[in-house]
């Protein structure tokens, strides 16, 4: 049996097991009132070698996630069974679902050195596109120049769509792409439950903007300062609390007013987070690295980028915002 086949079998067998193995940290979750109970346990939902980024919950209580290097969108159903949801995604690195049920992705094209050599050559640059039910490019340029490597995206109930690509941008209702500031070094991007506030990571700071339904953003301000680490993928709960992935530090939680509430530690460095599951009270998070078929930390040959990832889940007291997928 090949190593890939064995790896899939191990992932299925141990996908729901508590994860205490070589290459990960033992963590203790402390209470954050109204957010997570003391002693709550992370479990593995999925692990694999082909990446998992830009997580978004589905209406059925499952998960979609971008797998950039094989150019696919992966899917977990409500029981954490994995399948390939979409193929030929042009190197999608993040995915979301709008109010019309369309699958929208930040497509990174050929910008990652770990891209599979088995894929056909690509000539188009990064773009924000609808992938399903019909494919449509929404943005591929800013001020006449091709977009840089894309990171994350969010779309409001009203259709406002904003994304990060080095800095941060919004797509106005007329299709114009507007930048939010050349001095922003953004990765994660998120909207408040009422779609009126846009949150943007800027290294150790979270910025906030007022945003209108047409995608116009204004009133830039500092929302919060991270307690260690740099901001990455974000999500939001029904009470408007913001959850920020910060690598080895964990998932930092902030009130709607920007007050730091606490950190949920993760066994691995975290880069993406999303609510899903029954009643949207399960928090999913992507951790860097995974177990190989031998039960040890997966390694690649020297010089080959390691895209192995583990998706964890944890029961929450807080409920994710149900008004949007992300």
Task: For each feature predicted by the language model, list its residue ranges.
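Bacterial N-terminal signal peptides that target proteins for export
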Residues: 1-9
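Sequence-structural signature of mature extracellular/luminal beta-sheet repeat domains
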Residues: 21-326
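Bacterial N-terminal signal peptides
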Residues: 8-17
């Amino acid at each position: 049996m090949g190593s890939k086949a064995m790896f899939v079998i191990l992932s299925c067998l141990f996908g729901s097991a508590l994860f205490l193995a070589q290459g990960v940290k033992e963590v203790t979750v402390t209470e954050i009132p109204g957010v997570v109970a003391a002693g709550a346990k992370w479990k593995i939902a999925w692990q694999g070698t082909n990446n998992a980024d830009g997580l978004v919950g589905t209406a059925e209580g499952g998960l979609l996630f971008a797998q950039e290097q094989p150019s696919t969108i992966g899917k977990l159903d409500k029981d954490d069974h994995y399948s390939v949801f979409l193929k030929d995604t042009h190197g999608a690195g993040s995915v979301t679902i709008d109010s019309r049920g369309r699958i929208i992705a930040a497509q990174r094209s050929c910008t990652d050195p770990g891209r599979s050599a088995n894929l056909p050559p690509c000539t188009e640059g990064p773009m924000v596109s609808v992938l399903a039910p019909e494919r449509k490019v929404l943005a591929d340029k800013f001020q006449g120049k091709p977009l840089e490597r894309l990171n994350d995206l969010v779309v409001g109930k009203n259709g406002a769509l904003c994304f990060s690509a080095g800095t941060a941008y919004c797509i106005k209702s007329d299709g114009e792409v507007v930048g939010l500031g050349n001095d922003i070094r953004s990765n994660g991007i998120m909207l408040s439950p009422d779609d009126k506030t846009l949150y943007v990571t800027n290294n150790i700071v979270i910025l906030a903007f007022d945003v209108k339904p047409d995608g116009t953003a204004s009133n830039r301000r500092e929302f919060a300062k991270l307690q260690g680490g740099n901001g990455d993928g974000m999500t939001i709960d029904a009470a408007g609390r913001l959850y920020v992935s910060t690598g080895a530090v964990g998932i930092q939680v902030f009130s709607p007013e920007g007050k730091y509430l606490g950190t949920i530690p993760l066994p691995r460095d975290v880069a993406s987070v999303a609510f899903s599951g029954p009643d949207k009270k399960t928090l999913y998070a992507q951790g860097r690295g995974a177990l190989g078929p031998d039960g040890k930390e997966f390694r690649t040959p020297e010089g080959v980028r390691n895209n192995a990832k583990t998706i964890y889940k944890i029961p929450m007291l807080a409920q994710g915002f149900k008004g949007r997928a992300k």
